[in-house]
Amino acid sequence: MASGLTRLLLRGPRCLLATAGLTLIPPVRGVKKGFRAAFRFQKELERWRLLRCPPPPVRRSEKPNWDYHAEIQAFGPRLQETFSLDLLKTAFVNSCYIKSEEAKRQKLGIEKEAVLLNLKDNQELSEQGTSFSQTCLTQFFEDAFPDLPTEGVKSLVDYLTGEEVVCHVARNLAVEQLTLSADFPVPPAVLRQTFFAVIGALLHSSGPERTSLFIRDFLITQMTGKELFEIWKIINPMGLLVQELKKRNISVPESRLTRQSGSTTALPVYFVGLYCDKKLIAEGPGETVLVAEEEAARVALRKLYGFTENRQPWDYSRPKEPVRAEKTIAAS
């Protein structure tokens, strides 16, 4: 310690003044680094908490800046369609909403005459929209794929009018936000009924031709990238192929193993070809010979039905003929 004091005295008064000057520097003003780190940690913790336990969904009508009448009026122009305002309002009213509102009024002790709401539900519009949509889609598929049997057409129509596809389209068109339902989020069955009620309202407002274009633009487009037998489930493709070939007076197909690879490994692959009159009509791969034969039968059926992967895409630019629309409304 004495040696350190001696060095300090030998350096002179400048060193003493320098050290004294360092102690006189005022502290830095501002947010400390420790506080910033704690604030960032708190924000990150809150974000993870919201991801882990998200808050329950809230109706759009319960949030600020909401005008239901203005939203109803803007629904048609946003889709470039013309709706009757009264029909469109009716299309969004479900029977479960009417029952729940009447039950709430009864709990408040309101008189029976005042309990009843002067509203009409969308049941009738939904039935008309469903019937027209199924008929219109059936005609679309029959015109586009004339060789496709009735069972295949029905499977495609059922797929496009099912809850999964219809609810996906309805949510992207903001139908869910305008739907008057007792529960939220809106149940899929109620949302599907509401969407077809909107189609029924469009049918009465703009006619069958505009409604068929609406169905083409929003439902047929959901077939993009879809494979036929992902939608139409076939248990015995070879048996169906034999029936189709008999209708066309073609001999029964014969299956032959054309190629194989890795047959002694864990991931083998086989290629089976189907021959009719010594001509190769289809070839399909599979992990076993039986699976490859079934895949070859599916490939042959796609060729017969005109539903191949390299088929011509759907024409959305050409307007539909009014005669077809008249046939659709007459059939529905």
UniProtKB/Swiss-Prot annotation:
A cellular-component GO term for this protein: mitochondrial large ribosomal subunit
Q: Which GO terms describe its molecular function?
A: double-stranded RNA binding; ribonuclease III activity
Residue ranges of the RNase III domain?
86-228
Q: Where are the transmembrane segments?
A: none
The listed locations are:
Mitochondrion
Q: Which domain of life is it from?
A: Eukaryota
* Keywords on record: Endonuclease, Hydrolase, Mitochondrion, Nuclease, Ribonucleoprotein, Ribosomal protein, RNA-binding, Transit peptide
Note the CDD domains from the entry: DSRM_MRPL44
Which processes are annotated in GO (biological process)? mitochondrial translational elongation; RNA processing
Q: What is its EC number?
A: 3.1.26.-
Q: Which InterPro entries match?
A: Ribosomal_mL44_DSRM_metazoa, RM44_endonuclase, RNase_III_sf
Class of this enzyme: hydrolase
Q: Where is the transit peptide?
A: 1-30
Q: Enumerate the spans annotated as DRBM domain.
A: 236-306
Q: Tell me, how does this one assemble?
A: Component of the mitochondrial ribosome large subunit (39S) which comprises a 16S rRNA and about 50 distinct proteins.
Q: What does this protein do?
A: Component of the 39S subunit of mitochondrial ribosome. May have a function in the assembly/stability of nascent mitochondrial polypeptides exiting the ribosome.
What family is this protein classified in? Belongs to the ribonuclease III family. Mitochondrion-specific ribosomal protein mL44 subfamily.
The protein's name is: Large ribosomal subunit protein mL44
